[in-house]
Amino acid sequence: MLSRLSLLSNSRAFQQARWRIYRLKVSPTVHASQYHILSGRKLAQSIREKANDEIQAIKLKHPNFKPTLKIIQVGARPDSSTYVRMKLKASKDSNVDCIIEKLPAEITEVELLKKISDINDDDSIHGLLIQLPLPRHLDETTITNAVDFKKDVDGFHRYNAGELAKKGGKPYFIPCTPYGCMKLLEEAHVKLDGKNAVVLGRSSIVGNPIASLLKNANATVTVCHSHTRNIAEVVSQADIVIAACGIPQYVKSDWIKEGAVVIDVGINYVPDISKKSGQKLVGDVDFDSVKEKTSYITPVPGGVGPMTVAMLVSNVLLAAKRQFVESEKLPVIKPLPLHLESPVPSDIDISRAQSPKHIKQVAEELGIHSHELELYGHYKAKISPNIFKRLESRENGKYVLVAGITPTPLGEGKSTTTMGLVQALSAHLGKPSIANVRQPSLGPTLGVKGGAAGGGYAQVIPMDEFNLHLTGDIHAISAANNLLAAAIDTRMFHEATQKNDSTFYKRLVPRKKGIRKFTPSMQRRLKRLDIEKEDPDALTPEEVKRFARLNINPDTITIRRVVDINDRMLRQITIGEAATEKGFTRTTGFDITVASELMAILALSKSLHEMKERIGRMVIGADYDNKPVTVEDIGCTGALTALLRDAIKPNLMQTLEGTPVMVHAGPFANISIGASSVIADLMALKLVGSEKNPLNDKNIHEPGYVVTEAGFDFAMGGERFFDIKCRSSGLVPDAVVLVATVRALKSHGGAPNVKPGQSLPKEYTEENIDFVAKGVSNLVKQIENIKTFGIPVVVAINRFETDSQAEIEVIKKAALNAGASHAVTSNHWMEGGKGAVELAHAVVDATKEPKNFNFLYDVNSSIEDKLTSIVQKMYGGAKIEVSPEAQKKIDTYKKQGFGNLPICIAKTQYSLSHDPSLKGVPRGFTFPIRDVRASIGAGYLYALAAEIQTIPGLSTYAGYMAVEVDDDGEIEGLF
């Protein structure tokens, strides 16, 4: 600030302006000297000490509280350096961190603006000051307005200046020098209400801001400038004079009213041969002649100058406190209104009838900063994992898992219930909530399943964008997986066609510009082989062979190529048929992309670093000595991570009622966890979480809710969620919502089978209490399964129009008798969040209940024991029967050190058993284990009870046949 005043005083235009001065002829009077010196030094010291004390007090409760000022100095002007040192000293005296960044005078405006933008995005910096003057090639207005107005501790941003000038305006910051002047007046107990105040000077730095402050204090303000006539006469009427014109000793004694208050802002250097420097510092007021007529007067130096720096420190502290308060606030979700229709229109019509919020608004309501958001159009965005650093001190919100009973082929509405529940919590109960769901695969969307966005008035919007491509994460998985597959086959080809170890090694580690270097992945392989050499030319022939030859056994390769389309013709293919491949053919096949182990790794990784580590650990097969070969051995870890660098960032969308949804990852539920990502859950829980008060260890406010879902029924998806996902995340749900339907329970009670694409038998559309009463056994078993993990259960009866109240009462009674905390009916499909309010209240209550969580099995027990635990405790079976092929693989995994991993069992989702025809709760069956495979990077083994197709096919009439696009680009017929 002082540098700006120096500029003002040295302004040639200002100095040479012709001021019309008409001095008053007044008779000399006798005046007893009663003036008081308003010392800025003393008050500034007091302000710095108070700031120091306040910061220390806050740090006792919140150790991470650290007000920080960043000063950018462009060039090396001596006067600027002096002022910067003054600000640094004042900051240190006040316990404010001050970071000074000196930039070269020749920096371009583009470079400086980028630097400012980066600091704006840095949450550890609370105040940003650009030291003026800047070199002439830099536009000061552009530069100062580039500073985030919430960090503009100088108060120069157009927002702060404009708000200060408005009546009732609310600037974030007041410019430091005017602010200091007001503090001096306040210290002297000068009453401003109704007083005449004259401001000499109209600069945007001092004159205009101080005039606004005086007006806001109800003073009558006159601003004088170089064109003001009769200036002495105007000043002589003033009760308060603010001199900020930049002319040395300009204001004379005969201008001043007896008893006036004079604040001298001027900083001017005039010749003085008695001084070592040859000049002395004076103000705009002729202090010696004026002081005798004043009641209060500020000296120069020692008046306003120290206050400028003190108020800068005060503004930085204010900025830090504001940010701290903002960080503690619970997100406020502003819901979109729903206009319900009956009968309920199609899902796509409902989606298109709603006008979504811009995704930036959804993010802002959640407290996500703009630099933490990457926009993909108007309604989709990615969230940067860097947000964790800002939110690390927050306690997690409440964590709710939505699971289901054993379903019919039509599905029982878990996703719809998830959306309805968060709409009810956020839009109707005022509790900020986030739905976390999987990203749907294109294959089923264009095949027979249709979309996966929920349905009716409880869905993700825009649903066509949700179901088609989204932000390209699945395509990134495809590219990474197929690069790995190509690298494996190519490595085998090159090893087979280059018999000479030395020649092969030279091509594997080539010279570039005459220098041979190991890549980072090669260095890691050398370390695993205990070859501690950095010079490629230093390896012995034996070491060269060990390093270069992977000797992959093609019969053991587990990596297949992937595509995100249902294409049955790719289930088995032969590669290498071209003449260029020299007869090296191999039978392999394609999987659907979401079946790739990379998708499971994406879902289970907590960070980019962990994802890279998991990718490197992926076992792609074995060598001829039956030793595992990893992605790290292939040298693909870095490249695969690079392809998935953006995919690790969760996607943000919204529900029909404008409540936030995170869409991330989508591992194949048949052979994987079938749940959305760990990183999305961790992020969402922080966003709706609460800060704790260190004094009483209580939350400052009630936390919000994160609602996610598990694939298939609880016995499959729920068990995997707890035993695999929760082991990876370290999280445990506070409650489980178990979705049940009258339709599914009738199916388990003996009603005819339900088939997709066919009309429901009349047993499902007419009341039949007997079927329901028999079928609730499946519901009871699933409740028992959940209670095995020690988590409270809420049963949500997803109501259909044909359900009778008597049927629903049978379900409620059975659920409560089985140990559910609540059993409620939910009508969210027809009514959106309004129809799930009772469910939302039940969930809130359930999350407050105590939980006694435990895993189903000890991972250090044998593979066979873990399989038996799942079959007996979750499915109700008697024992397992392991095929010879499966047993051979189990023995191999044990020898390779993979026996202590959790287990995922791939089986039918239509029965608790392995046989889809066995409804209800079958007992005493022997569960077959036909094969066991390993996803070492993802961190689990998976056993197959039946032949699982890892790439679906298309039916005679497939979903894609109805899809059209009109001339406006609107997609029709997809849903």
Curated annotation (Swiss-Prot):
One of its GO terms (biological process) is nucleobase-containing compound metabolic process. Pathway: One-carbon metabolism; tetrahydrofolate interconversion. Keywords: ATP-binding, Hydrolase, Ligase, Mitochondrion, Multifunctional enzyme, NADP, Nucleotide-binding, One-carbon metabolism, Oxidoreductase, Transit peptide. It is found in: Mitochondrion. Pfam families: FTHFS, THF_DHG_CYH, THF_DHG_CYH_C. Residues 1-34 form a transit peptide. Residues 344-975 are annotated as: Formyltetrahydrofolate synthetase. The gene is MIS1. GO terms for cellular component: cytosol; mitochondrion. In the N-terminal section; belongs to the tetrahydrofolate dehydrogenase/cyclohydrolase family. In the C-terminal section; belongs to the formate--tetrahydrofolate ligase family. It catalyses: (6R)-5,10-methylene-5,6,7,8-tetrahydrofolate + NADP(+) = (6R)-5,10-methenyltetrahydrofolate + NADPH; (6R)-5,10-methenyltetrahydrofolate + H2O = (6R)-10-formyltetrahydrofolate + H(+); (6S)-5,6,7,8-tetrahydrofolate + formate + ATP = (6R)-10-formyltetrahydrofolate + ADP + phosphate. Signal peptide: none annotated. Substrate binds at Y83, V84, R85, M86, K87, I130, Q131, L132, P301, G302, G303, V304, G305. It comes from Saccharomyces cerevisiae (strain ATCC 204508 / S288c). This trifunctional enzyme consists of two major domains: an N-terminal part containing the methylene-THF dehydrogenase and cyclohydrolase activities and a larger C-terminal part containing formyl-THF synthetase activity. Homodimer. Gene3D superfamilies: Domain 2, N(10)-formyltetrahydrofolate synthetase, Formyltetrahydrofolate synthetase, domain 3, Leucine Dehydrogenase, chain A, domain 1, NAD(P)-binding Rossmann-like Domain, P-loop containing nucleotide triphosphate hydrolases. This is C-1-tetrahydrofolate synthase, mitochondrial. ATP binds at T408, P409, L410, G411, E412, G413, K414, S415.
